Amino acid sequence: MINSMAELGGGYFPLDILLNSLEEASAGTERDKGTRFETLIRDWLIKEPTYRDLFSEVLTYKDWSKQHPELVSSCRDIGIDLVGVNSDGNGYTAIQCKFYDKEATVPKSGVDSFLASSNKPFFTRRFLVATNENWTDNVKEEFQQQTPPVTLITRETLANSTVDWAAYQRGELKEVAKRTPRDYQKEAIKKVISGFESAD
């Protein structure tokens, strides 16, 4: 077991480490693992620049359904985990969070309940966020044929996020600091550029 980032040396993958820690903290309980992952995705959606401006808030389905009894008759989990309140005032985004093994392949039956329950006029967007990398062509095609289509957010998208996953594991929600060259690096860059210019 890895006790710190330092033990990994260079080339570690903070998202993988974070997901492993969520799994360990859940002690094999699928429900707890799912809830922890949903919290992570809610936090990510409100911080990640690509998505944060889309929503005025992101709620659990249970909390959202309690606020909107006129739209849904039950608060029970029907395949939708989170609901984004669209900041443009145009409805809601249905979000399903799937904490799968990295190598898992998901059949269409694995997403049918989400597709059915989110097929409502007040859901103007649909996101499926998953930690696996393998999706059959049939499932991807099904997502695109839906109205509205389903946006698939993969492990790769999460890993390449501007959210600092190592900081998140420590309880901080922030973006990765932008790197700027040090003085000696700036000097080396100038010399390289100068070398290119003199070669022309």
Residue ranges and their predicted role:
Residues I2-A27, W44, Y51-R52, Y61, ...:
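ATP-dependent helicase/translocase motor core
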Residues K33-P121:
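Catalytic centers of nucleases
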